[in-house]
Amino acid sequence: VNDDVQYDLGLVRMADDRMIYVNADATLKANGTYYLSKTNGLLPQGYYPFDSNCILQLNGWFTCDQGTTYYQNGVMHGAGWDNIGGSFYYFDSNGYIVTGMVRVPYPTANLLPGYGPDAEDAEVNVPGKDGNPDNYDYPDRESAVFVFDENGVFQKEQCGVYNDNGITRWINNGMLVWHAGLVKDGDDYRYFKRNGM
């Protein structure tokens, strides 16, 4: 045994995305809630629970500097769509929820039926093609622009006019409509070009 070896690794994410805490004496936190001071940027300093197998037990929503994510049995959520508590969310490639108007892949038909590409979207999304001379980023066979609130909840009930950072857009069931054309908005009519504006 070499007494000069330092084991104070602190919080460590393992290959399976679960986390452990390695103390200075090479022991692991287990069976209790402990104040973690050396979190290595994975979590803020604070009190966290560990099970008998030394695994950090995060369950539920968690917000840190990188964003908001969801943990289940100590494992951070991966990328993609999910239904949590009856609300739909999209998690980016780092496992954090998206907010605002964001282009993401379509959800699976099992999760959200009716939210796939339509023939017109896929046909017009060719840069430089007639109908797309300005190379707008139209929906395609893989993804489209969806609306999420500040908590990351997909706004599937939202329909009508939507202010996208000063640009007026037309939304139908939480999804940007690129080819809305003439639409009735209350007592007025609005015309939306193929670019969704």
Feature map (PLM): residue ranges:
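Extracellular adhesion/carbohydrate-binding repeat motifs centered on closely spaced tryptophans
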Residues: 1-197
